[in-house]
Amino acid sequence: MPLSLRLSPSPTALSPTTGGFGPSRKQCRIPYSGVPTTKIGFCSLDSRKRGDSSVVRCSLETVNVSVGQVTEVDKDTFWPIVKAAGEKLVVLDMYTQWCGPCKVIAPKYKALSEKYDDVVFLKLDCNPDNRPLAKELGIRVVPTFKILKDNKVVKEVTGAKYDDLVAAIETARSAASG
């Protein structure tokens, strides 16, 4: 299905330095009626003035935010998914393939994702490709669980401590609803 795009420049979109359009990033929500998935689209407009016409580049990316399951993320998909989760609580399991305790808690973590249908559960493999994100989030040991609300870490559990993880999720859910 072709995409038709009509742009009319607003006075605020004009760049005073170039007399044309400056690069801008627009975010738009794309409604999706599927349950239990929410989709959000990001449209980036980068326009430049060329003579009497403007060149516009637009890209659209869809991010799925699922509840009732564990979603694998990486350094490129983590923040868009957290932002798309909106007001939902997000729990991130940071693990490695070789970690014994990570393997032990993985099925319990999956069961938690099925129990809490109002929480988004994510997994991040702390491999060399994802090291920048792991460093940004301050990981020191695996597994580490980070609980986020409104794009901010509100709780952390280090180690495969199932009871501590459940207590942290319950505390964060209570704080979010109260």
UniProtKB/Swiss-Prot annotation:
Recorded family membership: Belongs to the thioredoxin family. Plant F-type subfamily.
Protein name: Thioredoxin F1, chloroplastic
UniProt function note: Thiol-disulfide oxidoreductase involved in the redox regulation of enzymes of both reductive pentose phosphate pathway (Calvin-Benson cycle) and oxidative pentose phosphate pathway. Under light or reducing conditions, activates in chloroplast the glyceraldehyde-3-phosphate dehydrogenase, the phosphoribulokinase and the fructose-1,6-bisphosphate phosphatase, and inhibits the glucose-6-phosphate dehydrogenase.
Listed InterPro entries: Thioredoxin-like_sf, Thioredoxin_CS, Thioredoxin_domain
UniProt site positions, description: Deprotonates C-terminal active site Cys: 93
Post-translational modification remark: Glutathionylation at Cys-126 decreases its ability to be reduced by ferredoxin-thioredoxin reductase and reduces its efficiency in activating target chloroplastic enzymes.
Subcellular location: Plastid, Chloroplast stroma
Span of the transit peptide along the chain: 1-57
List of catalytic residues: 99 (nucleophile), 102 (nucleophile)
Amino acid composition bias (Polar residues), ranges on this chain: 7-18
One of the record's GO cellular component terms: cytosol
Domain of life where this protein originates: Eukaryota
Modified residues (S-glutathionyl cysteine): 126
Record-annotated disulphide pairs: 99-102
Protein species of origin: Arabidopsis thaliana (Mouse-ear cress)
Keyword Nucleotidyltransferase: no
Keywords for the protein's UniProt record, in alphabetical order: Chloroplast, Disulfide bond, Electron transport, Glutathionylation, Plastid, Redox-active center, Transit peptide, Transport
All residue ranges annotated as the Thioredoxin domain in the record: 58-174
Region spans: Disordered: 1-22
Entry's Gene Ontology molecular function annotations: enzyme activator activity; enzyme inhibitor activity; protein domain specific binding
Residues the UniProt record annotates as site (Contributes to redox potential value): 100-101
Biological processes annotated in GO: cell redox homeostasis; negative regulation of catalytic activity; positive regulation of catalytic activity; regulation of carbohydrate metabolic process; response to light intensity
